[in-house]
Amino acid sequence: MRKDDEGSLVRSLFNLLSGTFFSRLTGMLREIVMATYFGADPLVASFWLAFRTIFFLRKLLGGPILGLAFIPHFEFLRAQNISRATFFFRSFSRFFCYSAILFTLIIELGLCVWCSCVTGSLFDTLLLTIILLPSGIFLMMYTVNSTLLHCEKKFFSVGLAPSVVNVSWIGTVFLARNYDPRNRIFGLAVVLVIGFILEWAVTLPGVMKFLGQSKEVPQERDSIRALIAPLSLGLLSMGIFQLNLLCDMWLARYINEVGPLYLMYSVRIQQLPVHLFGLGVFTVLLPAISRCVQDQEHQQGYDLLRFSLKLTVAVMVVMTMGLLLFALPGVRVLYEHGVFPKTAVHAIVEVLRGYSGSIIPMALAPLVSALFYARRNYKVPMLVGIIAAVVNMVLNVIGCLVCKQVAVLAYATSLVSWGQLAMLWYCAGKSLPTYKGLMWRTFKESGKTVITTILAAVITIGVNIVTHTTYVVFIEPLTVPTKPLVSFLDQCGVFFAESALFLSVLFGLAKLLKTEDLMNLISFQYWKGHQSILRN
């Protein structure tokens, strides 16, 4: 396999983002169509609560933790013998397939009993969960296949696969827009199960190609027992983390009956930069650093991590400022259509601004964790994650009782995210002295990026004040709106005009001030694996 370096890392990230971008784009279209035709009522909130519960149950079985445990061990076995690695993956896949089926059957039986004892909105939530639950089996197998394809550097199909679900979702909502609200919600749940089956099927060709490389049974057979310890810690951490998310949803419901919808829609937007780029870098970085560890190339691993941290900070600083500036026009474009009320739009904007502070630490924390996972040290990041989740739940309950605003849940999450990053880096510096000053060095080198981005934001707001268009970015504008933003075209025009203004100012300042990290972001050559356009 080709040696890992900054160029190969960027090429792999480019391929992953190409597929993931289309999935996220269809996801945004899904949000627009869903808000336009299904609105914001308790039944839709029940649907989102059931949908969130499905992912909670899937992650209890491992979810993303599977890759963290599997990839370093798989790369270790492949370095010894390809047959051992192939046999191990077969065992790994069978185990989680059978576990997912058994787990689903048990939960389905429990939900059926519970469902027979309740009525009202809780009955709807439970029934939707029962319908959606089988999709968790295929979500699990998609995750298992994805871990293998990441090791094979086949990132495009993995990133593209979720778009199958989104396209099915969009088509169903559009076709069922005139049906009875209750029937169309339950029909959508059935279609989503089929969509998740197709998502899993997209990953099959790459998996079958790998398994065809070696069909012989190795003399030394490796059991998945080697992963029991890291998976146990991971499942505990993931379970508490998902419990934290569910706690957020139920607390939001306690504050406001439609609160889960506000939280869900804002989280979907907040996760866009984190999942599209932050976790994309981590997905590419973990196999690369694992190979560096197996080959004893510690300097190469240091360089890869430093490069990844700098790149991620540059992107996330821009994303954070963009989220603060464009929360209102962006939410208008996505949701302020049809039967979706303006009060819900404003509530989502306030929650979204609370989440903006979590983008940078949430993107950096997985990169720091890669240092531990690559050395098969799963204990530290898992324990830190558990502590952060527990603290977050405590802060959420306190904030909920004191403020009684859904947005307070988002601010608590942002605060805890920075604490989690600080704890992770402190532990990394203690156990790996070589990396001790790397995070501080990264933030120091990114100072110019932060200053340039803040200047661009100030200039953008200044232009809004001069042109009397502060209603674009502020819920309570400083000037009287020149015209109401009712039509979709008007909303899109304002959003893209504001975005173009900010980005043109940003990259104009970057060129003027020679902010290299920002200039790299718009260099196609850089993203294809070349060096800085300023150096060239």
Swiss-Prot record:
GO term, biological process aspect, one: regulation of cell shape
Membrane topology: Multi-pass membrane protein
Identification of the protein by name: Probable lipid II flippase MurJ
Function recorded in the entry: Involved in peptidoglycan biosynthesis. Transports lipid-linked peptidoglycan precursors from the inner to the outer leaflet of the cytoplasmic membrane.
UniProt keywords, alphabetically: Cell inner membrane, Cell membrane, Cell shape, Cell wall biogenesis/degradation, Membrane, Peptidoglycan synthesis, Transmembrane, Transmembrane helix, Transport
Family recorded in the similarity comment: Belongs to the MurJ/MviN family.
InterPro entries linked: Membrane_Transporter-Flippase, MurJ
Protein origin, superkingdom: Bacteria
Originating species: Chlamydia trachomatis serovar D (strain ATCC VR-885 / DSM 19411 / UW-3/Cx)
GO annotation, cellular component aspect: plasma membrane
